Regions:
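Class I SAM-dependent methyltransferase SAM-binding "motif I" and its flanking Rossmann-like core
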Residues: 146-176
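Hydrophobic, aromatic-enriched interface-forming segments
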Residues: 137-147
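Active-site catalytic pocket residues across diverse enzymes, especially alpha/beta-hydrolases
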Residues: 57-64
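Short glycine-rich or small-residue beta-strand-to-loop segments that form or flank ligand, phosphate
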Residues: 41-45, 74-77
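N-terminal glycine-/serine-/threonine-rich phosphate-binding loop
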Residues: 1-41
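Ligand-binding beta-strand-loop-alpha-helix segment within the catalytic cores
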Residues: 1-6, 66-139
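Glycine-rich beta-strand-to-loop/alpha-helix junction loops that act as flexible
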Residues: 44-49, 143-145
Length: 176
């Protein structure tokens, strides 16, 4: 049987107002987790739509409202196969907008490997296990649904997918 979630939705006239609310929610969640002796786990997309949120997160860090020392970050998707430091990787994007601008320890950064590998399915299972060992995802920031293409099961996890034509056209600007 299908389950339908009832998620609270906020609609904002200005993108800046939405970004500030999201960052405030992250700060509240992070402080709560840290006060419980746990790390806050964020799952982040590499999308231009997320840049205002990431810029506000960096401002919060610079203003002393947020430290990334007890925050773990998981990337939610990646192009495959690309070498990690190629311009188009989501790792590079997150490095430019978050990792290099905050005090996040390297060991708290979990990005999907994008270079060619022998057993992608086993790697994806290990990535899911890392998320589980970290306590699960507290907050997900995305502009889509982690490249869930039409036909993807609603309960799907980390996996290799083939992007459909519409997604490829949308992503093409990353490569030119």
């Amino acid at each position: 049987s299908r389950r339908y979630e009832k998620l609270p939705v906020s609609i904002f006239k200005e993108q800046e107002d939405a970004s500030k609310m999201i960052v405030d929610d992250i700060i509240i969640t992070a402080n709560k987790k840290i006060n419980e002796g746990k790390k806050c786990v964020l799952a982040l997309a590499a999308s231009s739509a997320c840049i205002p949120v990431y810029e506000d997160l960096v401002k919060a860090y610079e203003n002393g409202r947020l430290s990334f020392k007890d925050i773990e970050i998981f990337s939610i998707d990646e192009y495959y196969p690309l070498e990690r430091n190629e311009l188009q990787t989501h790792y590079r994007f997150l490095k430019e907008y978050i990792f290099d601008l905050t005090d996040i320890p390297q060991e708290n950064i979990h990005c999907l490997e994008s270079s060619k590998m022998d057993d992608v399915a086993a790697y994806c299972n290990r990535y899911e296990e890392q998320i589980k060992l970290s306590g699960g995802i507290d907050i997900l920031i995305t502009s889509g649904m982690g490249s869930n293409e039409p036909g993807s099961p609603y309960n799907s996890r980390t996996r290799l997918i083939t992007m459909n034509h519409t997604t490829r056209v949308s992503a093409a600007s990353d490569f030119f």
